[in-house]
Amino acid sequence: MRTTILAARSFNFATKREKIDVKNMRRFICLLLFTASVIQAAAQTKDLSDDSIQSDSAVMHFLTEKGTKIIPNNRVRLLKSGDKKFEDLFDAIRQARHYIHLEYFNFRNDSIASLLFDLLEEKAAEGVKVRALFDAFGNWSNNKPLKKSHLKEIKAKGIDIVKFDPLNFPFINHVFSRDHRKIVIIDGQIAWTGGMNVADYYIEGLPGIGPWRDMHKRIEGPAVDELQQIFLTMWEKATGEIIRGEHYYPNKNDTLFQLNPTSEPVSIAIVDRAPRKSPKLMREVYAQAILEADKKIELINPYFVPTKKVRRALKKAIDKGIEVEIMISTKSDIGFTPDATFHVAHQLMKRGAKVYLFDNGFHHSKIMMVDGKFCTVGSTNLNSRSLNFDYEVNAFIFDETVTGELSEMFKNDKKSSRLMTPEYWKKRSPWRKFVGWFANLLTPVL
């Protein structure tokens, strides 16, 4: 009897425990289902949120997080040729009243530079302060450099001209961190920046290459202050001279900058790459702008051998169905650069990008347009040298009209281009393919 009672109790206990286990299991399953539903709902909400954020807004947010200001209320004029750039610049120099600041990779010792320095001499005689800064390596690397005798003559004109980072022994110490920017500021009111230095070939082209295509822009408004700060910081670095004063930043407290009545206000971010201050910024912004694209990316760059981060971004954009169009030149001023560029472009073509081979001269423009909503124009080449080593500056312009103007130019330049196809690549000689492959191995230092 005792055994029977114990067995019954054990059975009842086991039954109760099983009931408890079943209840716990049910609760656990319910908890899992609830958690899964919450995660799914959150993911759907995130997807909806991400989809609702436009590419331009996303890039603005990214820039702000990186400490780069989005500056509203500017006016931008694109200058699509050397003729237009120098005509516009020279006209403004004639109107200068207080100071003229120039920062270039090089001033080529030719006729357009002579005209520029003669004009600057006239302004210096009127009491306008002229400061000019150029890169020592940029000067040395062009075939018509400014020599000591030329610099002596320029200084005698009343122009304060300075060479950035002179090439002294051991020269290897001066190979990297060059000043590749192109900036002019007049009276703190107007600035120019983009891809053009000072040389005749921006107007006349070069033998064996043909027309030299490039892109520059004129900016009026509060964004000029950012370019002024970049110049004065570099001037201090090169000379030790500290320049301060409110008259160098006339737009700082002017939130109601008066635009031309026919112009719409434009928001601009001045992205400055300085080797120590912001070494990763330019490649991060380029990559993010590519990743945020919703529909289309149009890109022109003369030495197209991007760093890994930018290449990965382009591949991801292609893989998610973004229309990626890249324009590269069949001719170049630097040796085997086209071969390296062709090698990279072919890899992206196989991935799904459209690659246009520009035949009508050399397209030295450094521009990118995204979704017809925003664009960038500047000095930055999409190669390791610009993205990893040199001083560079780009303006990211958040305006559909300016972006549309560049896209229209891109569309027209397709007429002077060939589309890279598998058939075209098959016809390319094995030697040229090998040179491209080998040159690509050197891209970390190109």
Where are these regions (language model features)?
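Bacterial Sec-dependent N-terminal signal peptides
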Residues: M1-K46
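Charged, low-complexity intrinsically disordered terminal segments
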Residues: V38-L446
